[in-house]
């Protein structure tokens, strides 16, 4: 996995609370088990006016020209609620998002985000209100999200957030569960060599 230390990116404001995983990636697109290819269906029922996904909704935020290429999603409370599908962070990262900033996240989505190198940043509702206003009033504004310093820098101000030290360590070093295991490969090999032949 790629390391996440600092990210600078354009911000798209999704001004909606309780965005559930079925809205993020509708159930009809869940047939695959690989992580790629879901971005084209991200927010499908909101981004498109037809079932085939051919007619863009001109009023949806991700279809507006000013937010094309956004890599940071600004959202409202309880983002990622609903079913526990891991396809939700897959769709967000496949679309190009690296960070989601919101007042709160559903627990399962929050964990799945870290597992897929998508950084969920929690800020107060007051800070989120300020950031929404900032983005809407300043076309093309970019935020600097620094995981080492645990800050979001925007509009000349710094907003502090907290990430569990273990999850922070994993993201900064690009470690998933396999990577964590491989850090102990030498000890695992030494242990295996000590086992009786019939257990090897």
From Swiss-Prot:
MF (Gene Ontology): 3-isopropylmalate dehydratase activity
Pathway in which the depicted protein is active: Amino-acid biosynthesis; L-leucine biosynthesis; L-leucine from 3-methyl-2-oxobutanoate: step 2/4
Thylakoid is among the record's keywords: no
InterPro entries referenced in this protein's UniProt entry, alphabetically: 3-IsopropMal_deHydase_ssu, Aconitase/3IPM_dehydase_swvl, AconitaseA/IPMdHydase_ssu_swvl, IPMI_Swivel, LeuD
GO biological process: L-leucine biosynthetic process
Single GO cellular component term: 3-isopropylmalate dehydratase complex
Keywords of this entry: Amino-acid biosynthesis, Branched-chain amino acid biosynthesis, Leucine biosynthesis, Lyase
EC number: 4.2.1.33
Catalytic activity as recorded in UniProt: (2R,3S)-3-isopropylmalate = (2S)-2-isopropylmalate
Stored NCBIfam families: leuD (TIGR00171), PRK01641.1 (NF002458)
Function, as annotated: Catalyzes the isomerization between 2-isopropylmalate and 3-isopropylmalate, via the formation of 2-isopropylmaleate.
Subunit description: Heterodimer of LeuC and LeuD.
PANTHER family per UniProt: 3-ISOPROPYLMALATE DEHYDRATASE SMALL SUBUNIT, 3-ISOPROPYLMALATE DEHYDRATASE SMALL SUBUNIT 2-RELATED-RELATED
Protein family (similarity comment): Belongs to the LeuD family. LeuD type 1 subfamily.
Protein name: 3-isopropylmalate dehydratase small subunit
Organism for this UniProt entry: Yersinia pestis
Protein's gene: leuD
């Amino acid at each position: 996995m790629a390391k996440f230390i600092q990210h600078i990116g354009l911000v798209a404001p999704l001004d909606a609370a309780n965005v559930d995983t079925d809205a993020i990636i509708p159930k009809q697109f869940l047939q695959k088990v690989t992580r790629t290819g879901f971005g084209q269906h991200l927010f499908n029922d909101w981004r498109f006016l037809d079932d085939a996904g051919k007619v863009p909704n001109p009023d949806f935020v991700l279809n507006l020209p000013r937010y094309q290429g956004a890599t940071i999603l600004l959202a409202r409370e309880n983002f990622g609620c609903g079913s526990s599908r891991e396809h939700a962070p897959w769709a967000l990262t496949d679309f190009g998002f690296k960070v989601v900033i919101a007042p709160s996240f559903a627990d399962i989505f929050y964990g799945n985000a870290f597992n897929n190198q998508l950084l969920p940043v929690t800020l107060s509702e007051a800070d989120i209100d300020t950031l929404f206003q900032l983005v809407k009033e300043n076309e093309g504004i970019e935020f600097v999200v620094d995981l080492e310093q645990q800050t979001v820098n925007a509009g000349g101000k710094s907003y502090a957030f907290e990430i569990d030290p273990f999850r922070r360590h994993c993201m900064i070093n690009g470690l998933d569960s396999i990577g964590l295991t491989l850090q102990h490969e030498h000890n695992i090999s030494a242990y295996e060599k000590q086992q009786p032949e019939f257990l090897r």
